[in-house]
């Protein structure tokens, strides 16, 4: 029996798959929907259609295909259409700043933005990043990320995203996208979808670690979980107008992410109404015709393997149209989607060529780095793009600090007689802030994790530097020990300190780097570099120990968090270049901590449920990672199994106190939901396709080695493609309906950006009064949770939140709304969102378990 996406996977992640018939299955969905320019895309779509109508076939293909790894200045670069003034598009990492560049800022990670619970700061960070990317001549930022969502706390790249809660992630994901695109740069929502672990994400990478597999991991999930958890933030991204989506390395129900017709054609383009373009993750492109028909619009970096000179697109895409296996309208739609995104963000007005090289810091070099060909020219212009962004970086760093525990130790007065700064995490990397490639080591303070989701630091203020400056202002003594294994000296300093500030960390990152035996994903949730022993030593010698944790997510603290000599605990995440200043702002009370933990702190790793899949379980085939927990991850799981966390999702203390009161609920719209009906328009072809002789390489063209071109070597299409299987019957690899350009039925849940417009109609207005009952100004985050009812639903789920600044003694009324999507469940039979007949109850408070206010909602449909 095959398990369709409409059914829950029935195999455990640890079990050995016995037969191919037992594998999860992703049903096909064709044809690939064509853009129609609805909503805010209208003007950009019209301009895109106009320009694409003037292009030849090979010019369109040039837009869809990267030129190859290390062939141009950016990590990804498309071909150009110089005849029409369309430049090569530069695509560059990362979600927290410009990777492989210089004179750029290193922003806090997405997980820190989540800890602020601040929509405005999410937007400001996005806008600041977009400005830097634009100033460097980058057209497409490869970020932000909502995949991984954070299914497992030990997932290597969770920190690149926001939170395991889809609502918190979705809001901040969307605000980040708006900020980036308001700066004139195309944002990329990634990694789509179910990219929840690093193990087995790429075959070559896994084989390099000694695993005998021939296909990447398959993330197997049921339809309800897909919609209510993992697809949720991507719907918010589409609704925000995101220009690009990056498909992921993993398979989804045993179909590769970049050729999965259900996730790309049905969910993203048909149901959510995505109007931009889908690009592959780097070398996540596995076929030509199959990927094109399944919805992949752009191949990155263009070559099949790095510097191979071969491509599934390029010449082969041209051949596919000429021999009829790929309809012209499909390639036209690819080009229209790319150009529509380009025009939508106003890139045509802001475009400048890249003024840096990803491959060298030398000022001069060859135009084409890998083959050392082309003009020898200035490749790095050393343009400083930082502006005043250090201010927002420091602000986010401070506002994302979560005060987990405070027994009166904080804030510090600045008059402490002796301050001990203890732990390697307080100091500098001996190799320098950028001493490890892609931050692939854990030395010194952890302000950024590792992998392609990184940026070079322009500088890094360490906690030791910043705190020493504070102590010197008060004429105190300050002693630091940053060797975690010198417990004798640590004890000596702790014993004479008025307050001991202990800095510890836990790192993770992308799977292409192995750091201390962690192949991207964390091996465990313990502290790194002997961190537990440092804390134990200090608490034995100092009765005023404050622990600061820089980490990629939760760590196990059960052994020491309740120790009476641990008087304060702060989580500071990955705060970027202003790390030391940000934590000093909080420690010394210039900033009243208002961060809330965006994940749950459990007592053991087992508290979180299913472990990562770290051993192959399907022979040498695709490892099968079954998401049997469904929607029950993080706090939802803790609630389901009545697990008591150490610190619950949404928890965070302040230097003041708040009180919530006066819950009011008002029905503002009782209209019924109307599923979308009708048909789309027919697919359109723009321009005409000539015979093969029109697409031969131009005479006199000096070809660059390994460069990916769109032209033909010969009018003999088989000779041009170089594919030994060329000429196989179409029915063997072209799915039924895949080339059909006739009007198609609209899905019930479709109809607008993010889905059916009725989902976003506000039904209820909710208001609450928040009073600052303390003596200092501070920030509070009222959080609204909904119980959807039903026997198999989470106890409650987050739906709304707002960060508010409130003066002492002041009251503020927070007003929010609940729309239909907030109250609905995914109906796997109707294939639509439905508000079930079960009672709906709302809860408002300051964490997922501190919810003093509650109210029952009237029934709506």
UniProtKB/Swiss-Prot annotation:
Protein's cellular compartments: Secreted
PROSITE patterns linked: GLYCOSYL_HYDROL_F3 (PS00775)
Disulfide bonds: none
Enzyme Commission code: 3.2.1.21
Signal peptide limits: 1-19
GO molecular function: beta-glucosidase activity
Top-level division of the source organism's lineage: Eukaryota
One BP annotation, GO: cellulose catabolic process
Keyword terms, alphabetized: Carbohydrate metabolism, Cellulose degradation, Glycoprotein, Glycosidase, Hydrolase, Polysaccharide degradation, Secreted, Signal
Annotated catalysed reactions: Hydrolysis of terminal, non-reducing beta-D-glucosyl residues with release of beta-D-glucose
Enzyme class, UniProt record, top EC level: hydrolase
Recorded metabolic or biological pathway in which this protein acts: Glycan metabolism; cellulose degradation
Functional description taken from the UniProt entry: Beta-glucosidases are one of a number of cellulolytic enzymes involved in the degradation of cellulosic biomass. Catalyzes the last step releasing glucose from the inhibitory cellobiose.
Protein name: Probable beta-glucosidase A
Annotated organism of origin: Aspergillus terreus (strain NIH 2624 / FGSC A1156)
Gene name, Swiss-Prot/TrEMBL: bglA
């Amino acid at each position: 029996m095959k398990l369709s996406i409409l059914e829950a996977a029935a195999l455990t992640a640890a079990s050995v798959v016995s037969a191919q018939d037992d594998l999860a299955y992703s049903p096909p969905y064709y044809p690939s929907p064509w853009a129609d320019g609805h909503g805010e895309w209208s003007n950009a779509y019209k301009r895109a259609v106009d320009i694409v109508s003037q292009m030849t076939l090979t010019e369109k293909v040039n837009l869809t295909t990267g030129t190859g790894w290390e062939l141009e200045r950016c990590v990804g670069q498309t071909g150009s259409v110089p005849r029409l003034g369309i430049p090569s598009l530069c695509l560059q990492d990362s979600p927290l700043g410009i990777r492989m560049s210089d004179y750029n800022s290193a922003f806090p990670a997405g997980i820190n933005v989540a800890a602020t619970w601040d929509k405005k700061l999410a937007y400001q960070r996005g806008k600041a990043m977009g400005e830097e990317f634009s100033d460097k001549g980058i057209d497409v930022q490869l970020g932000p990320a909502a995949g991984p969502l954070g299914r497992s706390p030990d997932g290597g790249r969770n920190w690149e995203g926001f939170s395991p809660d889809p609502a918190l992630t979705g809001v901040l994901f969307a605000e980040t996208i708006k900020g980036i695109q308001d700066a004139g740069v195309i944002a990329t929502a990634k990694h789509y979808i179910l990219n929840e672990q690093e193990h087995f994400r790429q075959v070559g990478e896994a084989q390099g670690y000694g695993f005998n597999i021939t296909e990447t991991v398959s993330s197997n999930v049921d339809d309800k979980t897909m919609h209510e958890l993992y697809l949720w933030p991507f719907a918010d991204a589409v609704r925000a107008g995101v220009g690009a989506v990056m498909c992921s390395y993993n398979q989804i129900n045993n179909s590769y992410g970049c050729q999965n017709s259900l996730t790309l054609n049905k969910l993203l383009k048909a149901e959510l109404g995505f109007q931009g373009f889908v690009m592959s993750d780097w070398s996540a492109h596995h076929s030509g015709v199959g990927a094109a028909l399944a919805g992949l619009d752009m191949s990155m970096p263009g070559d099949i393997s790095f510097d191979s000179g071969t491509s599934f697109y390029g010449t082969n895409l041209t051949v596919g149209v000429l021999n009829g296996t790929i309809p012209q309208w499909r390639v036209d739609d690819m080009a229209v989607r790319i150009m529509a995104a380009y025009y939508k963000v106003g890139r045509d007005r802001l475009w400048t060529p890249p003024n840096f090289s990803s491959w060298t810091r030398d000022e001069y070099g060859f135009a084409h780095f890998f083959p050392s060909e082309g003009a020898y020219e200035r490749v790095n212009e050393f343009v400083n793009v930082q502006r005043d962004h250090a201010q927002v970086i420091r602000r986010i760093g401070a506002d994302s600090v979560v005060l987990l525990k405070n027994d009166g130790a904080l804030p510090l007065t600045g008059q402490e007689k002796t301050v001990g700064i203890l732990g390697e995490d307080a100091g500098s990397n001996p190799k320098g802030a950028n001493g490890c490639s892609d931050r692939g080591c854990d030395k010194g303070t952890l302000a950024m994790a590792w992998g392609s989701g990184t940026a070079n630091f322009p500088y890094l203020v360490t906690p030791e530097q910043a705190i020493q400056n504070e102590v010197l202002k008060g004429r105190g003594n300050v002693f630091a020990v940053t060797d975690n294994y010198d417990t004798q000296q640590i004890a000596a300093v702790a014993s004479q300190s008025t307050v001991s500030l202990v800095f510890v960390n836990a790192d993770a990152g992308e799977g292409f780097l192995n750091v201390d035996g962690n192949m991207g994903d964390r091996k465990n949730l313990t502290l790194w570099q002997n961190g537990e022993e440092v804390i134990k030593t200090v608490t034995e010698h100092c009765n005023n120990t404050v622990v600061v944790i820089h980490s990629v997510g939760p760590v196990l603290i059960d052994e020491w968090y309740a120790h009476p000599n641990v008087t304060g605990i702060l989580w500071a995440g990955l705060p970027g270049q202003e790390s030391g200043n940000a934590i000093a702002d909080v420690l010394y009370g210039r900033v009243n901590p208002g961060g809330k933990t965006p994940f749950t702190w459990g007592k053991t790793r087992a508290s979180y449920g299913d472990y990562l899949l770290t051993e192959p379980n399907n022979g040498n085939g695709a490892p099968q990672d079954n998401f049997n927990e469904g929607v029950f991850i993080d706090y939802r799981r803790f609630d389901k199994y009545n697990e008591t966390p150490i610190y619950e999702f949404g928890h965070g203390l302040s230097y003041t106190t708040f009180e919530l009161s006066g819950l009011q609920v008002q029905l503002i719209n009782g209209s019924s939901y109307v599923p979308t009906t009708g048909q789309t328009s027919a697919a359109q072809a723009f321009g005409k396709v000539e015979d093969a002789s029109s697409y031969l390489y131009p005479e006199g063209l000096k070809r660059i080695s390994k460069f990916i071109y769109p032209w033909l070597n010969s009018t003999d299409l088989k000779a041009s493609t170089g594919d030994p299987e060329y000429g196989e019957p179409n029915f063997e690899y072209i799915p039924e309906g895949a080339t059909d350009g006739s009007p198609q039925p609209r899905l019930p849940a479709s109809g607008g950006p993010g889905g059916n417009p009725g989902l976003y109609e506000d039904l209820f207005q909710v208001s609450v009064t928040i009073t600052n009952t303390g003596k200092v100004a501070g920030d509070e985050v009222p959080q609204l949770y909904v119980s959807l009812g039903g026997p198999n639903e989470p106890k409650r789920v987050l739906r709304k939140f707002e960060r508010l600044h409130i003066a002492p003694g002041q009251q503020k009324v927070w007003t929010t709304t609940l729309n239909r999507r907030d109250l609905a469940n995914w109906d796997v039979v109707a294939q639509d969102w439905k508000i079930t007949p079960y009672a709906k109850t709302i809860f408002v408070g300051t964490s997922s378990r501190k919810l003093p206010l509650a109210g029952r909602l009237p029934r709506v449909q």
